[in-house]
């Protein structure tokens, strides 16, 4: 029987690479997102694996829109979340470098325009925490409908949550706090599935062109990390905690699949462990 992997946020920056790695590993892959569309890509390699994925639309806050997808599901991945409670920041990260985008980058921590109506769901509490809890609870309810014998096979099921290594400078503490709070709730469900908590740092994609604000941040963080490592020899713990290595979405994806396929693993996957994948 071909193993099935359902990725919520599967057309996102990291989610699509998890889908790609899963397809390569022989999984039947279902991507769930609001649009239900495959991500745009001009790369031939991307177009090939994308044809193997079932792209589906659903609202994670409305279990009725996706609960049937969880029938007989053994592995679920939550790859949703926000870094800022500002609905425009993801567009800023993905745009080509311009004076305007760099200016907005410098005011990255600024809140949303108070005159602009925003989604009530676009908060740390809802996107980073509640969306994961709602999905995990829906998965749990499906498991409870199985026979007692099947319910006891928790090690054969997994729920992967993409958390974060640490908070980032200029980013509100609500970001990392919401991630940690979600982790605590998911770990309470070990009776039903293996909670896999993945904690990457700032991510970049190995195959995307090195342009745009995300590339600007990646380069700056790499310079800081190398300076701390080779010039200061990592002697200052305060800097070690603040300046962390970046990690590619491909490395994170390999780590996710590696731990999903290990029936004995549950718990936290640190940034250091991800970098070894």
Swiss-Prot record:
What parts of the sequence cross the membrane?
Answer: none
Q: Does the keyword Thylakoid apply?
A: no
Tell me, in one coarse class, where this protein mainly resides: mitochondrion
Kindly state one GO CC term assigned in the UniProt record.
mitochondrion
Provide a GO biological process annotation.
ubiquinone biosynthetic process
Keyword GTP-binding on this protein?
A: no
Please give the Gene3D superfamilies that the UniProt record associates with this protein.
NAD(P)-binding Rossmann-like Domain
Family matches, as InterPro entries: ComplexI_NDUFA9_subunit, Epimerase_deHydtase, NAD(P)-bd_dom_sf
One term of GO molecular function? protein-containing complex binding
Q: Which UniProt keywords apply?
A: Mitochondrion, Ubiquinone biosynthesis
Pathway connected to this protein: Cofactor biosynthesis; ubiquinone biosynthesis
What happens when the protein's gene is inactivated?
Shows impaired de novo coenzyme Q biosynthesis.
Q: Which SUPFAM superfamilies does the protein's record reference?
A: NAD(P)-binding Rossmann-fold domains
Subcellular location(s): the record lists: Mitochondrion
Show the PANTHER family listed in the entry: MIOREX COMPLEX COMPONENT 2 (PTHR12126:SF16), NADH-UBIQUINONE OXIDOREDUCTASE 39 KDA SUBUNIT-RELATED (PTHR12126)
Additional detail: Present with 1470 molecules/cell in log phase SD medium.
What does this protein's UniProt record list under function? Answer: Component of MIOREX complexes, large expressome-like assemblies of ribosomes with factors involved in all the steps of post-transcriptional gene expression. Component of a multi-subunit COQ enzyme complex required for coenzyme Q biosynthesis.
Task: Give the record's family classification.
Answer: Belongs to the NAD(P)-dependent epimerase/dehydratase family.
Q: Quaternary structure per UniProt?
A: Associates with the mitochondrial ribosome. Component of a multi-subunit COQ enzyme complex.
**What is the protein name for this chain?**
MIOREX complex component 2
Q: Which organism is it from?
A: Saccharomyces cerevisiae (strain ATCC 204508 / S288c) (Baker's yeast)
Q: What is the lineage of its organism?
A: Eukaryota, Fungi, Dikarya, Ascomycota, Saccharomycotina
The primary gene name is: COQ11
